[in-house]
Amino acid sequence: MEAAAMAVTAATGALAPVLVKLAALLDDGECNLLEGSRSDAEFIRSELEAVHSLLTPNILGRMGDDDAACKDGLIAEVRELSYDLDDAVDDFLELNFEQRRSASPFGELKARVEERVSNRFSDWKLPAASLPPSSVHRRAGLPPPDAGLVGMHKRKEELIELLEQGSSDASRWRKRKPHVPLRIMGGEMQKIVFKIPMVDDKSRTKAMSLVASTVGVHSVAIAGDLRDEVVVVGDGIDSINLVSALRKKVGPAMFLEVSQAKEDVKEITAMLAPVKSICEFHEVKTICILGLPGGGKTTIARVLYHALGTQFQCRVFASISPSSSPSPNLTETLADIFAQAQLGVTDTLSTPYGGSGTGRALQQHLIDNISAFLLNKKYLIVIDDIWHWEEWEVIRKSIPKNDLGGRIIMTTRLNSIAEKCHTDDNDVFVYEVGDLDNNDAWSLSWGIATKSGAGNRIGTGEDNSCYDIVNMCYGMPLALIWLSSALVGEIEELGGAEVKKCRDLRHIEDGILDIPSLQPLAESLCLGYNHLPLYLRTLLLYCSAYHWSNRIERGRLVRRWIAEGFVSEEKEAEGYFGELINRGWITQHGDNNSYNYYEIHPVMLAFLRCKSKEYNFLTCLGLGSDTSTSASSPRLIRRLSLQGGYPVDCLSSMSMDVSHTCSLVVLGDVARPKGIPFYMFKRLRVLDLEDNKDIQDSHLQGICEQLSLRVRYLGLKGTRIRKLPQEMRKLKHLEILYVGSTRISELPQEIGELKHLRILDVRNTDITELPLQIRELQHLHTLDVRNTPISELPPQVGKLQNLKIMCVRSTGVRELPKEIGELNHLQTLDVRNTRVRELPWQAGQISQSLRVLAGDSGDGVRLPEGVCEALINGIPGATRAKCREVLSIAIIDRFGPPLVGIFKVPGSHMRIPKMIKDHFRVLSCLDIRLCHKLEDDDQKFLAEMPNLQTLVLRFEALPRQPITINGTGFQMLESFRVDSRVPRIAFHEDAMPNLKLLEFKFYAGPASNDAIGITNLKSLQKVVFRCSPWYKSDAPGISATIDVVKKEAEEHPNRPITLLINAGYKEISTESHGSSENIAGSSGIDTEPAQAQHDNLPAVRDDYKGKGILLDGRCPTCGRATKIEEETQDRVADIEIQTETTS
């Protein structure tokens, strides 16, 4: 809340940040403010601080219908004044020394404050929140009684089946399907069914001939009991023109069905269908109906309430009005439930209680009474519109679970509540109310139009506005009903011209808050909007910049929020974006395994545009916009969105004042974007030209020459630029540069002059290297170079002391510079899909904050903690330079992606290096490769390491004698991994007392039935075997060892012990190796047997001398593992060793 109080908001404008900026100006002795100007600034600051102190707790912290407050004349004046004051401060700071001495920047603003704020502030009171009667809240989402329940029958049957028969869907969640537009584009097979009164075969032949001659039609047939249906299958069919032609030449045709052809439908259904269990069938005792406002949640719940009511001894239908907290109406809701339950079956829905709760004692009394009354009864409880999880917890507590067939139905528009219900209760089935299909949506809209008698005047083909309404409403029943009704009211003004038609539809959209016939729809949307805190409303209103045909890119929107001053940190903004998803305002499509995209329902966008207009927050201009209205507005345009098809010449020809516009977003290819008069935008801070294909290098150079010096955000993603011009250096205040998906191949040296740059995003470009001037960007906290040909990062990245996020995903980078350890504020390092397998050990200095994304998964690897300070303080300066050759941090491992990075000693060694023993005793994890055995003194050193929790031992050659682990030391060790041809190891009594995980990676070798002794590992929980994919799991050395472990696992006191054996039994090579001869070495690289480098290392130690192997150090023939080949991690399957208990 403290951060939100200092941000730009839709209600208070730039009031909070401009007060901070004004205070800094007054405190800066080098600004050369004249005495008169200083006095003006101090007066303004004093007056506005008093206003801010009043508004902050009363507007920022409260929910509900505060439109009366935010639209109040004084608050509106303060809001506009804050923007002008912000501009005035920046205007003054751009002046040179001499100009400042003669400037009077605040004189006019002081007069405005005196006249319009100070004189009215003394007796001004904050307008009270005006909430409509609670009955309005309950009924706002219901369609009119005569609207008909089009499309509800299928939902009703599905829900009744769930309640009566249960579900075999193991996911317990029926997802809504993505909306398919009414017009199915070319290339996709579609099925269209028309109903036409055809009295004889002549009219049928005429209809079939007409349809068969239509472009895209593959087949046509007559169907229906009365042979009055025409079934058409094809691709790219213009269904609107076809139905218009049938009406003109055959008779009054109407749509019965518009869908994808059967083959495609089957495929899509299979893709969207949840995973179902084969044998299980679960009883469904509670259904959570989830959906958008106006989606039919309450309507279908009411239908179920009446359809099933006679099957239950008592039934309840209770609604909950939204509030800022769960407490105000909860007691009344409980009383309502109790009263209805006692009445038994009732035909009248409850009337909301308007009073407030009378304490927890009464609440608990009601809970106890409801629970006692329902305990022995078959009940149907419907709770409509849950807004707070705490509400549902209390209500759920009052409803007892019994075996008498009681059922509970709840509705909510909040994804977060549905997800928590799904997680917390296995009896809950989440049913997402999907959109009406195109057939039902068309029938509903066209039926309303024809019922009013306006069907003949509504237009045909492309001029049929019902077509536009169906596409805009995305199958939302309430929107279809009320927008179609509003269309009837506007029917006389419809014309044939395309632009006129768009303007009429735009007029209906823009009138959601004003047109009386749309009031029920507006009230339904207002419930969710007013339930948001102000900071979320501000972020949501900014989304009105999008057209309903646009998909929202999460990163792009989040970064614009930051540039606008609504949020300060990207992580915070990401959290807010997720909150808008949870509250149902932004819809996410896709899942964790596919591309995610986001959108806002077109009706919600229209509502947000109307709200934005009330605050003078953002102005949208697109095809069909009434430019005269925008030009004649008495308010200045603060933020402007130009949408596809808008003629930008209007900006120059109209009297529209954009000199105070701080944000310009151009969506899609507007007409002649290079003709946008950027010189008119004198105070622009945010410029987004992304995905505009007409922007090229020459245009960008001209744009940079015209741009305001105070631009903070420049979005050029998806444009056709090939280089960044030198003129960009003038953008001294640029904070976010987004040039991804362009054709640029280098960053200019001038990039170093952008001292305030915070985010640099060059993903999906042809950039091959970062310039050395990158070191000058001391404010940079996000560097994203993913999907570029960059193969090396310069050491200068270590100078970026404020860097928090570095992404080199899907690049050619193999190794990170050691200077990365100097990035003390780094929080996220993304090296997925690269050859980076290790980090320099210096990265351990930032382990407490750093999260590493490695491999090809999204699971983060935490770096080892608790040893950084000891490492730094315990290593002499002269020795520290050599440590890079001795130690690194492995983030990708042959055993699988570790959850915690492991300190790794590169290369192969005869013994544990002396430097490790002298300076790295404090390590919490260690991965080392030895040539053929673990010497006694080395084992003693490992056993006495005080913090060692994870140990990985790898052996180049097969140890001649088993390595014995006795009961001394290893007190902290929890994970032990052995990488050897065959695991020659034996655990004695009380060995490794806290070991929980034992893991083997092995290949092939002589069979042995020697005991391993896992029964002596008292804390053991899991044993994992990973066999090399080049050898069969039934090779003698492998199968014999597995058999030994299986037998010991059956005898372990902790049984059952989980045993994991790799499931990759299929041969990767046509040649398998089952003997101990000619076997691949167990190096860090899986190579084909013919390429093994160390297959025949002698087993006798003396023979190593002749092969260049140092007795007291590394084996130089192995080298440092910097060229580890990428490989797919072994898959493992669970095999639980079950033992029969003996009596």
From Swiss-Prot:
Keyword Protein biosynthesis: no
Region of interest (Structured coiled coil (CC) domain), residue spans: 1-190
Region of interest called HMA-like domain, as start-end residue ranges on this chain: 191-264
Subunit structure: Interacts with AVR-Pik through its N-terminal part containing the HMA-like domain.
InterPro entries, A to Z: Disease_R_plants (IPR044974), HMA_dom (IPR006121), Leu-rich_rpt_typical-subtyp (IPR003591), LRR_dom_sf (IPR032675), LRR_R13L4/SHOC2-like (IPR055414), NB-ARC (IPR002182), P-loop_NTPase (IPR027417), Rx_N (IPR041118)
Protein name according to UniProt: Disease resistance protein Piks-1
Domains (record comment): The HMA-like (RATX1) domain is responsible for the specific recognition of AVR effectors.
SMART domains: LRR_TYP
Repeat region (LRR), residues: 681-706, 708-731, 732-754, 756-777, 778-800, 802-823, 824-848, 945-968, 979-1002, 1004-1027
Family classification: Belongs to the disease resistance NB-LRR family.
Sequence ranges assigned to domain HMA in this UniProt record: 189-258
Function: Disease resistance (R) protein that specifically recognizes the AVR-Pik effector avirulence protein from M.oryzae. Resistance proteins guard the plant against pathogens that contain an appropriate avirulence protein via an indirect interaction with this avirulence protein. That triggers a defense system including the hypersensitive response, which restricts the pathogen growth.
Organism: Oryza sativa subsp. japonica (Rice)
GO terms assigned for molecular function: ADP binding; ATP binding; metal ion binding
SUPFAM superfamilies in the record: P-loop containing nucleoside triphosphate hydrolases, RNI-like
Record-linked PROSITE patterns: HMA_2
GO biological process: defense response; response to other organism
Domain of life of the organism encoding this protein: Eukaryota
